[in-house]
C-alpha cells in the first residue's frame, strides 16, 4: 500500500486487530521510506441491492434517503449521532449480507424500524406511523402496546 505522506510504495504492517464487531480489520502501518505511521481498515466489499418500490419500480439503494428518514424520526431526541451511524451501518451490513440483487423497500423499512426500536422508542413510533401509514389513534395505541410487551 502506498504511503499517504510520501507516496512510497513500501509500507509494513505493525499491528492488526479486529474492528467493527469483527467485520473489519484495523491495521497500523509504517512507511519504510519516511517512517510515518497511519491506520487502514479492511472489509469485504459487498454490493448493495437494488430496491423494489411498492409500485414495482427498481432503483439503486439510496443511503441519503435512509439517513434523512431516520434523522427525521430522531429529530429532537436525545440520541448521539454515532448511534445513528451504527444503526445505518448495521442496516447496510444486513442488506449486503442478504446476497440478493434486489430487495423490496418493505425489507429496508423493517430493518430501519428494528434499528430505531433498539435506539429510541419514540423515534420508532414516529417512523412506524409514516412507514405503516397509521390512519387513526387506535393504530398508534396498538403499536405502543407491542412495544410494552
UniProtKB/Swiss-Prot annotation:
GO biological process, one term: negative regulation of DNA-templated transcription
TM annotation in the entry: none
The keyword Repressor belongs to this UniProt entry's keyword annotation: yes
Domain ATP-cone intervals: 49-139
InterPro entries on file: ATP-cone_dom (IPR005144), NrdR-like_N (IPR055173), RNR_NrdR-like (IPR003796)
Keywords: ATP-binding, DNA-binding, Metal-binding, Nucleotide-binding, Repressor, Transcription, Transcription regulation, Zinc, Zinc-finger
Zn-finger (unnamed) residues: 3-34
Role noted for this protein: Negatively regulates transcription of bacterial ribonucleotide reductase nrd genes and operons by binding to NrdR-boxes.
Name under which the protein is recorded: Transcriptional repressor NrdR
Source organism: Haemophilus ducreyi (strain 35000HP / ATCC 700724)
Amino acid at each position: 500500500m502506498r504511503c499517504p505522506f510520501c507516496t512510497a510504495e513500501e509500507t509494513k504492517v505493525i499491528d492488526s486487530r479486529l474492528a467493527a464487531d469483527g467485520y473489519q480489520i484495523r491495521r497500523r502501518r509504517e512507511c519504510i521510506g519516511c517512517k510515518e505511521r497511519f491506520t487502514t481498515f479492511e472489509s469485504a466489499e459487498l454490493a448493495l441491492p437494488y430496491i423494489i418500490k411498492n409500485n414495482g419500480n427498481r432503483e439503486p439503494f439510496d443511503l441519503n434517503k435512509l439517513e434523512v428518514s431516520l434523522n427525521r424520526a430522531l429529530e429532537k431526541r436525545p440520541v448521539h449521532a454515532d448511534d445513528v451511524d451504527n444503526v445505518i451501518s448495521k442496516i447496510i451490513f444486513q442488506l449486503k449480507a442478504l446476497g440478493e440483487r434486489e430487495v423490496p423497500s418493505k425489507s429496508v423499512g423493517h430493518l430501519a424500524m428494528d434499528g430505531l426500536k433498539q435506539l429510541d422508542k419514540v423515534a420508532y413510533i414516529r417512523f412506524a406511523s409514516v412507514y405503516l401509514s397509521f390512519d387513526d389513534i387506535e393504530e398508534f395505541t396498538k403499536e405502543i402496546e407491542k412495544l410494552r410487551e
